[in-house]
């Protein structure tokens, strides 16, 4: 149990797993060189994870802001909230039922699978597939990949989407109430939100 007068924890773990449950903090900093980190049922204003080799698993937790930098490891977030900033060198990212105002993800090598509610999203990957399921209002969404397929679905009915691939196919769901502009540009509703999806080598599917 954390004493009530402790609001900030900084943890240095050269080797070994970290398991944290049922705490409330203003700030949590975790620097782990080797080992997995598991976080569950916590409330934090800010959490920062820097990991060299290991997986990060966060569930049923609320943050104002969560940031992470992993050299090699997978990221799993389930039923969480908070503005999210992630930089992953090698590893898969799986985010389910996450709500935020801003999400920024970058992965050099790995797949990204997300079901989120956030009006502002930026996702970049060098090599890997991207699968996005976005709920709620859209303000600005930018998804780019050097090599990989991109699948996106949204329940929003007010956006304009620009889809581009140099080597691949583009499939825009014909059941959506859209107007098509020149090229692979589409407007749904009044076109309030902006969506840009671009891959150099890969297919794009939008529904």
Feature-to-residue mapping (PLM):
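Short, surface-exposed interaction patches in beta-rich subdomains
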Residues: 2, 40-41, 56-67, 74-88, ...
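Right-handed parallel beta-helix
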Residues: 2-69
